[in-house]
């Protein structure tokens, strides 16, 4: 990389975050400018509407880039294979933890009897978010997608909903690690959600090297975070000259092996 690019990158890092939302600006050689936003896929009523300054950034951008277009994609888990009884797929301790959390969330355990383990984990996580007052229509990426449509902006998917489902279907042991991590780090997950909400409601991180609680096993982190960051990095590096607003899950912006570090 040329010296001028390195100087610009260092200067941007020294300036720190000057936005009222979690975001990092990255400029790549070839006049490519990315405004990376730490999105939350479900948000609270207080997180709408989006900041005026952010909407102006979108207006001045050439395109909006998201993980998947959740405004049009059918992400319902239809036509999934039926699994054997839950008691035959998880151990006694995991079953007891699942029953306890299901009762706490007001979910009938029978709902999970033949669902894939990764799907059970995602249903639990979504229900937990709802209990904290979060709704999909207030999610940051959903609001950005609606604004992009109003502004007639192109929308580019980093992976798309269908590829996300394929990735989940290919998890080792049919997603056992994802369910186990969800059960084990249940209360930590709730605190992490509240922390990410505060980045939008109160103040974003001022230090891009913040330490976040680890709620994934290493093998799962590699699949759900590291490998996806690598794929997204390659896709962003291949973009033509222009200005882009990029919305990815907030955890992809901070912590170990984050997307901005890979792009720099």
Label each PLM-derived region with a short phrase.
Residues 3-11, 20-216, 220:
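Structured, acidic catalytic/metal-binding patches in enzyme active sites
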Residues 222-264:
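A cross-kingdom marker for long, charged
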């Amino acid at each position: 990389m040329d010296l001028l690019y390195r100087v610009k990158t260092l200067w941007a890092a020294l300036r720190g975050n000057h936005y009222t939302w979690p975001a990092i600006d990255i400029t790549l050689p070839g006049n490519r400018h990315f405004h990376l936003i730490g999105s939350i896929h479900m948000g609270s009523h207080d997180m709408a509407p989006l900041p005026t300054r952010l909407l102006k950034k979108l207006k001045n951008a050439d395109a909006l880039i998201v993980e998947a277009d959740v405004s049009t994609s059918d992400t319902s888990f239809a036509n999934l294979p039926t699994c054997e009884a839950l008691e035959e797929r998880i151990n006694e301790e995991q079953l007891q933890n699942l029953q306890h959390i299901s009762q706490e969330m007001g979910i009938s355990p029978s709902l999970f009897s033949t669902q894939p383990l990764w799907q059970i984990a995602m249903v639990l996580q979504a229900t937990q978010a709802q209990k904290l007052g979060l709704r999909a229509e207030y999610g940051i990426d959903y609001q950005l997608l609606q604004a992009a449509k109003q502004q007639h902006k192109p929308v580019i998917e980093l992976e798309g909903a269908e590829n996300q489902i394929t990735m989940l279907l290919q998890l080792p042991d049919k997603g056992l690690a994802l369910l186990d991590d969800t059960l084990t780090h249940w209360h930590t997950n709730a605190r992490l959600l509240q922390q990410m909400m505060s980045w939008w409601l109160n103040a974003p991180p001022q230090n891009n090297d913040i330490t976040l609680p680890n709620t994934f096993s290493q093998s799962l982190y590699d699949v759900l975070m590291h490998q996806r960051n690598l794929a997204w990095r390659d896709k962003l590096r291949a973009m033509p000259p222009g200005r882009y607003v990029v919305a990815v899950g907030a955890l992809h912006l901070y912590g170990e092996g984050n997307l901005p570090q890979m792009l720099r």
